[in-house]
Amino acid sequence: LVLLFQFQSGWELLKGLKNITIDGGGSTLLMDGEMTSFIIDSCRNITLKNFHLDFVAPTQTEIEIIEQGKNHLLAKVHPTSHYKIENEKLIWQGNGWSFSEGIAQTYDRKEDVTWRSWCPLDGLKSTVELQPGLLWMNYQEKPDTPPGMVFQMRDAIRDEVCGLIQYSRDIRLENIRIYYAGNFGIVSQYSENLAFEQLYFEPEPGSGRTNTGFADFLQVSGCKGKVQIQNCRFTGAHDDPINVHSTNLQVVE
């Protein structure tokens, strides 16, 4: 079963509830646009389990370099990376979002290694679509990227999270496969006793994608009690897989 959601904010809002279990039964929840997939707010004893999360057009776009020339790159676009070309300018886009400059990492499939990198949108003079999904990219100077490398590109703005848990206690997420997390991962704040079991942040096997999210996958901020993270797998982050910290704010007049 695949469910498609095409609106902003959260598809699943749990607020002020207790003793609830939502079992997805292996369903895939497919997001279209920049969305927060779920919110657990002021709840107690909530379990979410047994479903997959993915996006129609992930906000991190991917190209694989086929050829490097004196002043050009020949690039193959991943099918889930949507774009348009206006006056020879390359613009990445999805439902309600777009960018034409940003941040990038490169990924080496053979070595399974990722580096911070220059962005192939930088210094780009013009782009020509040779055929759908195949781009000829002209540069002011010789681009320093060999064939076979994959660019993972994104905007610098983190304006949506995959999931939000706040002001809640005794929350459990179990057996959830997150093929793409969006502009941030699952953020837990001001909550108590959290359990994350068998969460798999990784591109869907066979999809050809190499990244899973903008930033931290699990961020726990200002929480208390016991936080359990067991039997999880994290692949393709542009920041920390797990980040646990306090939240300290200075009050000024």
What function would you assign to each model-found segment?
Residues 3-14, 56-159, 198-220, 239-253:
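Acidic/polar low-complexity surface segments
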Residues 3-21, 30-49, 54-73, 157-168, ...:
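Extracellular beta-strand-rich solenoid/capping regions of secreted or surface-exposed proteins
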Residues 13-26, 226, 231-250:
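Short, solvent-exposed linear motifs at loop/edge-of-secondary-structure regions
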Residues 29-31, 55, 180, 203, ...:
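Residues in short coils/turns that link rungs of repeat/solenoid architectures in beta-rich domains
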Residues 161, 165-207, 243:
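Conserved, compact domain cores that house catalytic/ligand-binding motifs in diverse enzymes
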